[in-house]
Amino acid sequence: MESAQIHSTRDSLFILWLTTLLVSVLATAAYIKFQSRPRPYSGFPLVTLGGPSETDSSHAANWFRRGRALVNKGLSELSGAFQISNGSGYWIILPSKYMDELRNHPDMSLRDALREENFPNYRGFDGFRQAFKDSTFTQEVIRVKVTQSLGLITANLANECQHALQENLGESREWQQRFIIEDILNIVAQLTSRVFLGERLCRDKEWLQITKEYARNSFMGSEELRQCLPLTRPLMQFFMPACTQLRKFSAAARRLIDPEVQARKRRAEEAIKLGKKPPKVEDTIGWMVEVARGRQVDYVGGQLALSIAAIHSSTDNLSKAVVKLCEMPEIVAPLREEITTVLESTDGWSKPALYRMKLLDSFLKEVQRLAPFTIVGMHRRVMKGYVLSDGTHLPKNSRIMVMNDKLRDSSVYEDPDTFKYDRFARLREQPGQEDQHQLASTSSEFATFGHGEHACPGRFFAANQLKIIMACLLLKYDFCFQPGQAEKARVIPFEMVETIDPTLKIEVRRRSEELDVTKVAKETA
């Protein structure tokens, strides 16, 4: 009897101890969450979609599904700066009128603005890790090597485009139904990889799958982690679907790319030992080796970083352009006429030839104007407190987004809500405006590639690649909406991004082009 009482007392004490421990842990977790919870910035109106009772989780959900609507609400209701929450922190939103004032300011950091949003120190996020570790390296590869080699790589891109079109759209003269977004993504991934990794890997099915999926899973993985308590993220990453996929893709990318990097290094070292110049290269994997100059570089992470930056935004522009051709078939003929005239009167696919395709350039830019991939012109972290010209104080360590909100402004564009494929071609005809309205040009009124010191360094490559693909699509194929599909040419929102519904089907058929694009490409190469 006495023994039973002792056991009962021990059980009661254990339960009391366990209860006390659990309460303490929960109280500590609640305290940590409260203390670490981001606070709104003083002096900036907080814009929400659900009112003042919104929680962090509802902030995150609204940002994920309706981020652009949230920001547009603030822009329409307020004339100056305001703030929003994406669930993991607050951002000050600034209209584009502040863009020129901030675009090159030394105390405004792009890298620090995005670092905590993208978890570069977590496994699998290798592309972000290399980009944030040494942003100057990637920029040097793009600005110094890729941009200055556009004349060299244009023919390679045109040639690869013929292979990619054949592989994805085929040669059928009959109308066929296609998931056009997926086809365009495949084509962009292959051409981009031709410049990034060379001829062999750009057709490797496993690599193409990695490069297409890595960016999507990077952003999804970041979103998954942002919705977790900071204390739990190091553990929760191993249970998140997108994070798990990222680790698999990163490992596979290393298996494919590392041997190529080592082979390039050996060839360069052997040439130097023999007193010769290293072999000439025409892809970023070789240019990375040249630019590294003894620096510790994660070459695979660098390639994944380029994939994040290059593929999905270009796919979006081209997808929306094809949709516009289906909506406005009357603009197809003048575009085809220009492309044919230029290719017949020049030496085929070349940088000067692409420059002369001004209607095509204008068409793609007008697509961007009315259907931009994102409406954010700049992300920055304020490294030192700063007072704007109108007296607005940006606190130290605050994060800001400057909007690209002039794209439909009637003070900038005549009849701004109407699609005019030749709008920018006509603007370039004005004295002194020749170089101001090209697809790759940036300004505070048109910042789809960003603006200022941190504008997209690869925009000149992107513009040339977009024109090559679009020109080949126009000359080689006809497009139209499948009956009942026009209404599916809608956009799907994701944070500040809007993309075409990937389930959209379009009718495609091979046509007899005005000149043999394949022959022109081969003769130019």
Curated annotation (Swiss-Prot):
Membrane topology term: Single-pass membrane protein
GO CC entries: membrane
Superkingdom of this protein's organism: Eukaryota
Record's subcellular location: Membrane
Residues bearing carbohydrate: 86, 317
Cofactor(s) needed for function: heme
Disulfide cross-links: none
Keyword check for Heme: yes
Example GO molecular function: monooxygenase activity
Signal sequence extent: none
Xref: Pfam families: p450
Xref: SUPFAM superfamilies: Cytochrome P450
Single GO biological process annotation from the record: secondary metabolic process
InterPro entries: Cyt_P450, Cyt_P450_CS, Cyt_P450_E_grp-IV, Cyt_P450_sf
Transmembrane segment boundaries: 12-32
Gene3D superfamilies the record matches: Cytochrome P450
Pathway: Mycotoxin biosynthesis
EC number(s) per entry: 1.-.-.-
Keywords: Glycoprotein, Heme, Iron, Membrane, Metal-binding, Monooxygenase, Oxidoreductase, Transmembrane, Transmembrane helix
First-tier enzyme category under EC: oxidoreductase
Residues that bind heme: 456
Family note: Belongs to the cytochrome P450 family.
Record function comment: Cytochrome P450 monooxygenase; part of the gene cluster that mediates the biosynthesis of the diterpene glucoside brassicicene C. In the first step of the brassicicene C biosynthesis, the bifunctional diterpene synthase bsc8 that possesses both prenyl transferase and terpene cyclase activity, converts isopentenyl diphosphate and dimethylallyl diphosphate into geranylgeranyl diphosphate (GGDP) that is further converted into fusicocca-2,10(14)-diene, the first precursor for brassicicene C.
Identification of the protein by name: Cytochrome P450 monooxygenase bsc2
Organism: Alternaria brassicicola
